[in-house]
């Protein structure tokens, strides 16, 4: 059992409040996932730089800064607890291999919009650690994890990002992730954990080479074996999919200003004007998407 949450803002008037809205949603899902938590915030860099989200793990920030100066031309390093957002004009094709070669750190996401933060611990502590309330943006996705099939580590936490400005959170389990992992590795995909959700994220990234997000998730109904509710994010918005059995809960609240999704309605009870929202459960096997 895990908790998933997401907000897509239709109106810009709530952009500065996005972090605060999401933080309450995450904390309310602590009972569904007390082992770790994480979130992805989409907020395009004003200078159109690429943003690389990095977990330092046990590496000292000063040592990381000293080492990275030798290898990468960057504009800014923004430290937030044990995470760093590296901003650079350099494209991912050049920067990603360099960061992946530094074995002491974990590259958890990259793109011109996305920033990812995740860590082991209770969601309430993770929210405070990264000061989620201060974040602004256009949309955001979050996850609280109760570990089942893989270790309780930062690399085992959601969201997973395996492509530029892409991320995925997942409540459920996949039974064919080992076979799918082997196939994706043959196509060049890389994985940092044994988590089934990372495989699903890799599958989506691989499929997006030839399809849009809605088509990719629809194809996943035949390729991904298991029980799941997905929230998949891109630079322009997000999409939601439940498997065709739909045993994993999800509820959506939509107003003229935002769309919110969570595993339980209680996570959305604090949102503005939620009492007048259109509230519904996503149908099994149907892709719902919102974006610009």
Can you name each region flagged by the protein language model?
Residues 1-292:
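Conserved short alpha-helical segments that host acidic/polar catalytic motifs at enzyme active sites
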């Amino acid at each position: 059992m895990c908790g998933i949450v997401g907000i897509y803002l239709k109106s810009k008037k709530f952009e500065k409040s996005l972090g605060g809205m999401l933080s309450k949603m995450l904390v309310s899902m602590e009972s569904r996932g007390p082992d770790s938590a994480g979130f992805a915030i989409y907020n395009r860099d004003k200078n159109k730089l690429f943003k690389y989200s990095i977990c330092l793990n046990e590496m000292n920030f000063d040592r990381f800064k000293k080492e990275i100066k030798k290898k990468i031309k960057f504009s800014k390093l923004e430290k937030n607890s044990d995470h760093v957002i590296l901003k650079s004009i350099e494209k991912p094709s050049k920067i990603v291999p360099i960061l992946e070669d530094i074995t002491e750190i974990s590259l958890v996401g990259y793109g011109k919009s996305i920033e990812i933060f995740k860590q082991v611990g209770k969601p309430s502590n993770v929210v405070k650690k990264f000061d989620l309330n201060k974040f602004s943006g256009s949309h955001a996705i979050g996850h609280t994890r109760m570990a089942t099939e893989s270790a309780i580590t930062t690399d085992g936490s959601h969201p997973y990002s395996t492509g530029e400005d892409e991320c995925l959170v997942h409540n459920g389990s996949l039974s064919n992730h080992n076979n799918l992992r082997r196939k994706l590795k043959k196509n060049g995909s890389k994985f940092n954990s044994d988590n089934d959700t990372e495989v699903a994220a890799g599958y989506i990234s691989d499929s997006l080479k030839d399809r849009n997000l809605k088509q990719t998730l629809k194809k996943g109904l035949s390729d991904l074996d298991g029980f799941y509710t997905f929230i998949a994010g891109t630079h322009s918005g997000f999409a939601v999919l439940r498997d065709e059995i739909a045993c994993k809960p999800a509820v959506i609240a939509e107003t003229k200003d935002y769309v919110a999704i969570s595993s339980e309605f209680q996570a959305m009870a604090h949102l503005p004007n939620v009492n007048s929202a259109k509230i519904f459960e996503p149908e099994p096997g149907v892709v719902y998407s919102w974006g610009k």
